[in-house]
Amino acid sequence: MKYLITLMTLFTIFLTLPLHASGRVPFGHQLIPVQNYSRATEQIAISGLIGDGGVQALVATGFKTVIDLRTANEGTADEKALVERAGLTYFNIPMTVAGISEEQLAAFTQAIESAQMPTLIHCGSGNRAGAMWASYQIKKGMDPEAALEAGRKAGMRPPMEEKVRESFIR
């Protein structure tokens, strides 16, 4: 199993070497160890869990920052240690599927706007990360329907979409 993980990581590194030099995040099929990975912009990606070999793949593809939206009981302490040991910046803004508060969105805004790029925003599945991305885009003035579509593409599911609509679309 370790051999397979090492092989997958090396394969990912090989495929994404040109992107590392450009400072752009890779497309989804190019970052295998990160679940439900999607490219939101040239500098920002959104995903679910970072799997075995995922932190190494992030480093190899040029990522500088990880914004983790999971709660402490989802393993954030271990991930923080791995990410920081690899030389990346780590932010944790714990949130649940209960919705996004103004305080959480403010903390996210501060994190994303101060982050070194490229940046990965993630949670357990991509649902919360997609919802946070959509909420941020709405607050920044993007057309709400376009922001929600971006959130859906990143993994936001209907129950979280409704919470985003209720909280941030007036």
Describe the function of each predicted region.
Residues L19-T119, W133-R170:
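Cys-dependent protein tyrosine phosphatase-like superfamily
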Residues F11-I13, G126, G151:
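Glycine-centered small-residue hotspots that permit tight backbone geometry or close packing
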Residues T6-P18:
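Bacterial N-terminal signal peptides
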Residues M1-I5:
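Positively charged n-region of N-terminal signal peptides that target proteins for export
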Residues T119-G130:
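A phosphate-binding catalytic loop at a beta-strand-loop-alpha-helix junction
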